């Protein structure tokens, strides 16, 4: 299969939408990471997503829509869930809801009685879904377990000749996947951190929201409710090690010639890394998160690199999502001075 690159022109997106209508898989941009789009009501198309990614069959898929009205056919929506969608959609929030009997393929749900939905803030994504005329599944458009793609080039690296097309809308803005909140139960639970934070959810809901993202792993015989909970995710082939700001100067003393550092600009300046490559994470939590997967992918492709040392961020705001993804990429391996 030859993979075609589409621009975000009207004609290109309509052509990409027809491919999805016809059961093909097309990667598409969102504000978080690039997704792998296929008709969520076509089991043959859904299977192609699992094959392209090498994704375990019990890892549920997120359904992606262009309009919240599309959900009513598939799920039961509480007043609280609808309030979240009204406030945060389009945006970086995925909501888990109870399905209506027989309305969602078990390939999407992993056999659960719930399904996750998202309405992305990217115009090209929503236009593509409208062109396809159906809700689409939208897992990250990377080989399963590897760092998520934040550019069309990242998607091409993993998916060339495995999928029908890629819609290129440049780099994503957020850089990590959406927040996942389980609204199928009485007390909402965050299962994956993202740009939408626990305090923001609690402010809208006016109720307690449990953050389970530090204890969200599940047993090997249990189907996870959300992606990222059960299997290794976000991990390059290279060794990744986290480090704290207070350990930076000690780390500099033990860096091997083929080690590299990913850190904020002030940290790179403090470490004075004249003899080592360094990947800038910018000056803010937002720029750091935007650049995390791009840096991991860049160094993973360099055969000369041995270890990637990455600065941890303060666990506030989107910094919590940054540390979550970094911890998984590193297998929770931290530098010890």
Tell where the protein language model's regions lie, with residue ranges.
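Active-site-adjacent structural elements in enzyme catalytic cores
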Residues: 1-337
